[in-house]
Curated annotation (Swiss-Prot):
It comes from Candida albicans (strain SC5314 / ATCC MYA-2876). Its EC number is 2.3.1.286. NAD(+) binds at residues 26-46, 109-112, 201-203, 226-228, 248. This is NAD-dependent protein deacetylase HST2. One of its GO terms (biological process) is rDNA heterochromatin formation. It is found in: Cytoplasm; Nucleus. It catalyses: N(6)-acetyl-L-lysyl-[protein] + NAD(+) + H2O = 2''-O-acetyl-ADP-D-ribose + nicotinamide + L-lysyl-[protein]. Residues 276-331 form a coiled coil. Zn(2+) binds at residues 137, 140, 161, 164. It is an enzyme of class 2 (transferase). InterPro entries: DHS-like_NAD/FAD-binding_dom, NAD-dep_sirtuin_deacylases, Sirtuin, Sirtuin_cat_small_dom_sf, Sirtuin_class_I, Ssirtuin_cat_dom. Disulfide bonds: none annotated.
Length: 331
């Protein structure tokens, strides 16, 4: 059985020879960041939605259900919102290919924006299923700024449109909605020009994204990085296909080693870990301060209530004494 190095050498050689890489990413590239994928039996996102009391798991991303009850989505969004997670080594690997001019495009099913956080430029990214980068009202389609939406979420409120009071949601593509125009326009341009296709961390079950790896030209070197064979790699394999049934981050590490980028990968990854660790510590401290302020406010309120109660009791006593005095005077 060939080693992972042997499996990946042709990929590294293609990149060294000037071939550009197009990525087709799924949730599996972000599980190393702590974000659950969607369909794993025990750890997947859909497997952990029982607490939301949904009629069916996918309802959390169903546009008709959202219009009736957006609360389950926003309960989930608190956990998935960008800034809660740091990019993985795979995301940084993509950025390193961009830096050396070896990146063609990144087609991603993910809504976590970790490619952006790793520093991949917008012109390379096609978020097939949308993202948290912008937000609109589902009724009048007016835009809401990300800062405003975050304020609603922080206050545990459902974001509502300031124009028509309709529900606002991030521009994530829900079931029942069309994919972004950018997805179709760029794929029409890119389709015949894909030289190296790295398909990573995706089950290739959601169309039309799932059809993309099968549409690349016959000269394209297709690479699958996944836990199992999926899509056309399984049903319509090509002789030149490279199959790496390994963790996405491990494959990223190996490819960086073969390309002489391992030192850069480790450097940027450690630097980002420290940055996000500091940010997390700062956020934790902010939460602690907020909790302390709330506690102090409650204590003040309780003291004030106690004072008011005492004053009211004293007033009641005074009223009774006055009533008794009036009664005596009447006699």
């Amino acid at each position: 059985m060939p080693s992972l190095d042997d499996i990946l050498k042709p990929v590294a050689e293609a990149v060294k020879n000037g071939k550009k890489v197009t990525f087709f990413n799924g949730a599996g590239i972000s599980t190393g960041a702590g974000i659950p994928d969607f369909r794993s039996p025990d750890t997947g996102l859909y497997a952990n939605l029982a607490k939301l009391n949904l009629p069916f798991a996918e309802a959390v991303f169903d546009i008709d259900f959202f219009k009736e009850d957006p609360k389950p989505f926003y309960t989930l969004a608190e956990e998935l919102y960008p800034g809660n997670f740091a990019p993985t080594k795979f995301h940084h690997f993509i950025k390193l290919l961009q830096d050396q001019g070896s990146l063609k495009r990144v087609y991603t099913q993910n809504i976590d924006t970790l490619e952006r956080l790793a520093g991949v430029e917008d012109k390379y990214i096609v978020e097939a299923h949308g993202s948290f980068a912008s937000n609109h009202c589902v009724d009048c389609h007016k835009e809401m700024t990300t800062e405003t939406l975050k304020t609603y979420m922080k206050d545990k409120k459902i974001p509502s449109c300031q124009h028509c009071e309709g529900y606002v949601k991030p521009d994530i593509v829900f079931f029942g909605e069309g994919l972004p125009v950018k997805f179709f326009d760029l794929w029409e341009d890119d389709c015949e020009d894909v030289e190296v296709a790295i398909v990573a961390g995706t089950s290739l079950t959601v169309f039309p994204f799932a059809s993309l790896p099968g549409e690349v030209n016959k000269k394209c070197l297709r690479v699958l990085v996944n836990k199992e064979k999926v899509g056309t790699f399984k049903h319509e394999p090509r002789k030149s296909d490279i199959i790496a049934l390994h963790d996405c981050d491990i494959v990223a590490e190996k490819l960086c080693t073969l390309l002489g980028l391992d030192d850069k990968l480790n450097e940027v990854y450690e630097k980002e870990k420290i940055k996000y660790s500091k940010a997390e510590t700062k956020e934790t401290k902010m939460h602690e301060i907020e909790d302390k302020l709330k506690e102090e406010a409650h204590l003040k309120e309780d003291k004030h209530t106690t004072k008011v109660d005492k004053k009211e009791k004293q007033n009641d006593a005074n009223d009774k004494e006055l009533e008794q005095l009036i009664d005596k005077l009447k006699i």
